[in-house]
Amino acid sequence: LVTTSSKWTLPPGTIVTGRWKGERYLIQRLLGQGANGVVYLVKQMKSSRLYALKMGFDTIDLQSEINVLKALQRRKRKIGSTGKRDLSYLVEVDDYSLEGKEIPFYVMRYVKGEPLRAFLAQQGSRWLNVAGYSLLQQLEGLHGLGFTFGDLKPENVLVSPYGEVELIDYGGVSENGRSVRQFTEWYDRGYWGAGGRTAEPSYDLFSFAVVCIHLLAEAPLKEVATGLPQTRSKGDLLAIVQGEASLQPYRKWLERALEGKFRSTAEARQLWREQVQKQVMQRKAKSPTPAWMMGAFTLSLLLLLCALFFTFWN
């Protein structure tokens, strides 16, 4: 057990046994740590299935998060969401006894993958096209249920080898119209004086725009992010988008997201798809990239788009 400032992490190999239901989970590794808890990759002992398990630093805070996830489940059942992909938000809720304390935890489904930053470092920044589209699909589904993710940042986005995205750590998920429960400053539009912290689709789209800037133009973002609050503004972000070559393929989308001009997440997803298709066509026309490599990337993109289409519309 590692403890720092009342926060702790459990090492790989630790077995977490639920006090009430008795399920046993073997910790594989740490997936992420936020303001209100830690998320682990775990293996259920009886089935060997992998899940994401979150433990909370504060019982009341985590219970509030669990209540939001349960509300998501109820809303999804009421709407009658269908599809082949399992989109369950909760697998199990229980307590873990540690050093005389009861630590609440919940278990969620897990998609094997890497954090977004690590994925792009391995595969290349071009794969943001695929992962970004999948992320917008995830957000569109969440927004359609009446909720905003809130704490959208690279650490909370896992990407499978084929670019499929899974959101982890739902600590910031908030019902639309209410205040965002949890956020990270750099990705918060209030931090940039670009709007309030009301939970709504445009809040997540703004956050994703800053995530893109962070991943593709980190140095200039760091420079303006550390400035004085009274001088920091949305205009700084727009200037980076307009001035950095790495962001030009996404310029139109990023500007609209930062300005809050998308009418819906579906519209944002559609524009993202259009800009990806445009990039593919341009590369086919002039890129020296080997044909086999371009074909592999294009095929992966098409397969993902088809899979996502049938998942959400069947």
Can you name each region flagged by the protein language model?
Residues G171-I240, P249-R251:
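C-lobe/activation-segment region of protein kinase-like
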